[in-house]
Swiss-Prot record:
Annotated EC: 2.7.2.11
Phylogenetic lineage: Bacteria, Pseudomonadati, Pseudomonadota, Gammaproteobacteria, Enterobacterales
Organism whose genome encodes this protein: Yersinia enterocolitica serotype O:8 / biotype 1B (strain NCTC 13174 / 8081)
Cellular component terms (Gene Ontology): cytosol
Any one GO BP annotation for this protein: L-proline biosynthetic process
Keywords: Amino-acid biosynthesis, ATP-binding, Cytoplasm, Kinase, Nucleotide-binding, Proline biosynthesis, Transferase
Record's protein name: Glutamate 5-kinase
UniProt-listed InterPro entries: AceGlu_kinase-like_sf, Asp/Glu/Uridylate_kinase, G5K_ProB, Glu/AcGlu_kinase, Glu_5kinase, Glu_5kinase/COase_Synthase, Glutamate_5-kinase_CS, PUA
Amino acid sequence: MSGSQTLVVKLGTSVLTGGSRRLNRAHIVELVRQCAQQHAKGHRIVIVTSGAIAAGREHLGYPELPATIASKQLLAAVGQSRLIQLWEQLFSIYGIHIGQMLLTRADLEDRERFLNARDTMNALLDNRIVPVINENDAVATAEIKVGDNDNLSALAAILAGADKLLLLTDQAGLYTADPRNNPQAELIREVHGIDDALRGIAGDSVSGLGTGGMATKLQAADVACRAGIDVVIAAGSQVGVIADVIEGTPVGTRFHALETPLENRKRWIFGAPPAGEITVDDGAVTAIMERGSSLLPKGIRSVVGNFSRGEVIRIRNLSGRDLAHGVSRYNSDALRMLAGHHSQQISEILGYEYGPVAVHRDDMIVS
């Protein structure tokens, strides 16, 4: 239909449980009703849902389990099926089919798998099926987790080619301070560009009971806005919130998309969870930030993590501040050997070479 929009709706644990130990089914029913209403108008809806662990814990009668990754994965394995059944039952009331997509970081940091996931998403949406997305917590370890569903929702929005991303939480939006501790805190209505001051505000506030606080929501907003996607942070309890976002009615905090969004490949580079990170010296910082240069091995001071050639990595300065994301031309072991050396020495050190740069400027997105 003309004017149809694609909206990604992310529902965190605090929204799905209402702050309790169990899923708040009445509230979920209302959110599904709102989604179905917009679906009937021709809009394309994508759900990013938390709650698998909470659903598993509830279904098993709140067992006493050790605080281990295995326990969380056990609960997720039990709860994931319960959660998807709930979404299926509720959407079926409105004659809407859903399709489950379980993702891990590996599905998103590899370009080919990213494109495959995008094709699946588009196939579902083209057939009027609502994708329901969650991280695959039953198998994901720290090494392969995206880490939180806020950032996962930004990546889902990129996959879906979304117009808007709605992050539902237990607060009305982003405030100038934590409203639970500071009665003078004011709601920030509009954001045009995310800066260090805003990051400082978000870093001091938390949201709900899940893994994502306001800081991760700001990270997600940054990724999505750079991809040309408007983002709204709003309360899940706000009456008619989904219709408000679709219609452009002011609600919560709105982050305006960049007027000149990143092209598709660079959206993937910026959005993909980094497989590792490198720290660079001041000379490299100047070359990257002021001259728009590629990163040479000479400027590398340290390498963290194990990654392959062609994976996305984070580039940081000596103070630990993020400078850029980029696709590494060499694997982590090779970069450790090359760190601090001139490009002319690459072949001598490694016995092979893939060119003189560690990360080419064309494969780099400055933060």
